[in-house]
Amino acid sequence: MMRLRGSAMLRELLLRPPAAVGGVLRRTQPLGTLCRRPRGGSRPAAGLVAAARLHPWWGGGGRAKGPGSGGLSSSPSEILQELGKGGTPPQQQQQQQQQPGASPPAAPGPKDSPGETDAFGNSEGKEMVAAGDNKVKQGLLPSLEDLLFYTIAEGQEKIPVHKFITALKSTGLRTSDPRLKECMDMLRLTLQTTSDGVMLDKDLFKKCVQSNIVLLTQAFRRKFVIPDFMSFTSHIDELYESAKKQSGGKVADYIPQLAKFSPDLWGVSVCTVDGQRHSIGDTKVPFCLQSCVKPLKYAIAVNDLGTEYVHRYVGKEPSGLRFNKLFLNEDDKPHNPMVNAGAIVVTSLIKQGVNNAEKFDYVMQFLNKMAGNEYVGFSNATFQSERESGDRNFAIGYYLKEKKCFPEGTDMVGILDFYFQLCSIEVTCESASVMAATLANGGFCPITGERVLSPEAVRNTLSLMHSCGMYDFSGQFAFHVGLPAKSGVAGGILLVVPNVMGMMCWSPPLDKMGNSVKGIHFCHDLVSLCNFHNYDNLRHFAKKLDPRREGGDQRVKSVINLLFAAYTGDVSALRRFALSAMDMEQRDYDSRTALHVAAAEGHVEVVKFLLEACKVNPFPKDRWNNTPMDEALHFGHHDVFKILQEYQVQYTPQGDSDDGKENQTVHKNLDGLL
């Protein structure tokens, strides 16, 4: 693959419009030539605004919904509060860098040495860099910052800061995202130093976003894993409200501190692998991880010691027994790391040979990295309470010691103390959702980009969560929900949708299996609505949403494929579309159907197939009130005209009720084909 050199080359490649499916509608004119700015004026050319707003490169996702739809107040003080008070302003950073004795920054070297070539042995990459630089300087090719400005400004010369922040939030990013620190610092500085503090012109806007332009461009192009994040969060909110009505269950009371939580607490937080965030309910209330820490410490152990070493001491099979049973497998090992016996043994493997204080600090630092440095705390009251009421766990510990399940030289009582400490680590729904997203993202924290866990550790952890993570309910959960998850007696459910997102659902009332009643209901409803189940077919799924797809793009591709097949006379392609239950009467932006196109081109076989096999309506009118018969007559295709004329006599219109319209399409297509 050719090496890309310099930002100008990246801009050149990104700004090239994509070719349509099958080679149709391929644009030969670069986007930049359509977007030139008129001389002698400060307002952007209409072409540039239209291109920035409508061009498929942006995906239509840059429009802000305005301050009235969840946006911010336009007052500078409230905007400053929204942007946060953390971080070092750019001016202070410069002063710190210019302290006496500090070495000056190295001068940038040349981009390419003369005569340097790419992987194919030519200098195409260097020429593209030069061409891109020249086009940007001449104004022929708008920069990414320009396109982003015009996308949000929608024809205005200045952007209100609150409008930019509202548009940013609609993509799922937060102003507190560490990846946007430079942008937020510059916005804070701009609001403090400019007279027109709540408005950004193009130059100020470019200055603010240029440090994070790649992430912002990706967000506004709707290139995140969930493109239409606002629609997805509305579904999450509906599922939350539905689960909130569940009133069963009982708050765990065998650990006194847990019994103090209100049964009405209920929160859900989502974090995708791209760092899109959404929270609803009591998501900032700290609670203890309890058993939800078991997969996390297992992942740490495998990351540090490897799979083979860890599983010398613990098995991989579901036990089929209660999580706190005194029972081992036929090899005298705990069945898996998700039951108490297995978790105690895994605890003994972490940082062997050091004292408990250092071990605890090590695990806390690890969990902080997984949570993207969001809240991870410790409840000493819960720790003391659990230690005082931990007779069953002490019994398990002595049984494990008798069976020589620990590494040689292990202090069993000290390990149980460490075990109780880890169960008493506190999180919120928001920080735990980032931990789950780190597992979903292959071990990379989505909001810091830091590698935390090895792929091996993540894979093994998710496998065990899938088979053993929900106590005695694990088999049913794997059957109905089909996703890796781990529950805890504090009421949390750590849910992972691999390669998509992580979630934390928290509600203290538990069912008889020890799982959160509201959390289980939410997970069931989520998989019923979206095709997240591990065995949902992504190509031929039933009536389920796929948040990973962008609905508009799929409809556009469907229409293009259908009309292009009719244009080229490809009956075999049309047969495939009909068998896949595609609507053979769908229209383009001119209200033209496949029958219009086939009649205009004179494709007799296509017309016969659409009429006889698919039983499409022969009377559709386009925006000029032309029917397929008018098209055939206009272009002199008399054989097609005759077929349409004969079919119109025997055609019987069918009802268009919404209920069963899709089934009607399927049966109509199948009956005709058979």
Swiss-Prot record:
Residues 58-71 have a biased composition (Gly residues). Residues 658-674 have a biased composition (Basic and acidic residues). SUPFAM superfamilies: Ankyrin repeat (SSF48403), beta-lactamase/transpeptidase-like (SSF56601). Residues 320-327 are annotated as: Highly mobile activation loop. The record marks L72, S73 as: Cleavage. Residues 89-101 have a biased composition (Low complexity). Enzyme activity is increased by phosphate, due to increased kcat and increased substrate affinity. Residues 56-123, 652-674 are annotated as: Disordered. Residues 1-54 form a transit peptide. Its EC number is 3.5.1.2. It catalyses: L-glutamine + H2O = L-glutamate + NH4(+). The modification N6-succinyllysine is found at K135, K169. InterPro entries: Ankyrin_rpt, Ankyrin_rpt-contain_sf, Beta-lactam/transpept-like, Glutaminase, Glutaminase_EF-hand. GO terms for molecular function: glutaminase activity. Substrate binds at S291, N340, E386, N393, Y419, Y471, V489. Synthesized as a 74-kDa cytosolic precursor which is proteolytically processed by the mitochondrial-processing peptidase (MPP) via a 72-kDa intermediate to yield the mature mitochondrial 68- and 65-kDa subunits. Belongs to the glutaminase family. NCBIfam families: Gln_ase (TIGR03814). Homotetramer, dimer of dimers. Tetramer composed of 68 and 65 kDa peptides in a 1:3 ratio. Can assemble into higher oligomers (in vitro), but the physiological significance of this is not clear. Interacts with RAF1 and MAP2K2. Interacts with ATCAY; the interaction is direct and may control GLS localization, negatively regulating its activity. Catalyzes the first reaction in the primary pathway for the renal catabolism of glutamine. Plays a role in maintaining acid-base homeostasis. Regulates the levels of the neurotransmitter glutamate, the main excitatory neurotransmitter in the brain. The C-terminal ANK repeats prevent the assembly of the supra-tetrameric filaments. This is Glutaminase kidney isoform, mitochondrial. It comes from Rattus norvegicus.
